[in-house]
From Swiss-Prot:
One of its GO terms (biological process) is cell morphogenesis. The keyword rRNA-binding does not apply. The keyword Transcription regulation does not apply. Cell division inhibitor that blocks the formation of polar Z ring septums. Rapidly oscillates between the poles of the cell to destabilize FtsZ filaments that have formed before they mature into polar Z rings. Prevents FtsZ polymerization. Keywords: Cell cycle, Cell division, Septation. It comes from Aquifex aeolicus (strain VF5). Belongs to the MinC family. SUPFAM superfamilies: Cell-division inhibitor MinC, C-terminal domain. This is Probable septum site-determining protein MinC. Interacts with MinD and FtsZ. It comes from the Bacteria. Pfam families: MinC_C, MinC_N.
């Protein structure tokens, strides 16, 4: 059985509540995601570990077909649950405003110049990122920063920093993911990041 919840569009949460028959599950998933209301959404997929690798691959193919991209919820121990909780901000952050949270942060709006977002986990901005974004501040160098338009003043993941000049801040027009690769913070199109992008829900 599949449960779909709209956190606040364009973000939806899909939870696989029980394994059951894989063909029936895939059919149900396809039918639900085919509705126009979900078109172009970012999907948070919870409980994918109940599926076999080949079943999971089929689910991922459907998610890629019907969504902007997807993020897998990560199963955590009880001691980490509180600090890894997802914080959702349903507004644009103006200059001088600051959001800080020990877990993951989802911004349903823009982060304007001179606004700051600080997270112990990952940061997702469903809009323009023009301010400062610092992820993985509890020492997590596997954290990522996602934005529909990436034009930041400064990016930080763990202890690694990337300061961007005005000339470097022109977004290519598609969603990007910032992550650590080697000794540097690199940007990649979000379409190529589904396999490693994880949210600590």
């Amino acid at each position: 059985m599949i449960e779909i919840k709209g956190k606040t569009l364009p973000v939806i949460q899909i939870k696989i509540k029980e394994k059951g028959n894989i063909d029936k599950l895939l059919k149900e998933l396809k039918e639900k995601l085919s509705h126009n209301i979900f078109k172009g959404s970012l999907i948070i997929l919870e409980n994918p570990e109940v599926l076999k690798p080949e079943e999971r691959k089929k689910v991922e193919e459907i998610l890629k077909e019907f969504s902007r991209g997807f993020i897998e919820g990560k199963k955590e121990g009880k001691e980490k649950r509180e600090e890894s909780r997802l914080l959702i901000i349903e507004r644009t952050l103006r200059a001088g405003q600051r959001i800080e949270h020990r877990g993951d942060i989802l911004i349903l709006g823009d982060v304007n110049k001179d606004a700051e977002v600080l997270a112990g986990g990952n940061i997702i901005v469903m809009g323009k990122l023009r301010g400062v974004a610092k992820a993985g501040l509890i020492g997590d160098h596997s954290a990522v920063i996602v934005a529909l338009k990436m034009e930041p003043q400064l990016l930080q993941i763990g202890k690694k920093k990337a300061i961007m000049s005005e000339a470097d801040r022109n977004s290519p027009g598609y969603p990007e993911v910032a992550k650590i690769e080697g000794e540097d913070i690199v940007l990649e199109p979000i379409e190529g990041a589904e396999r490693w992008l994880k949210l600590l829900l």
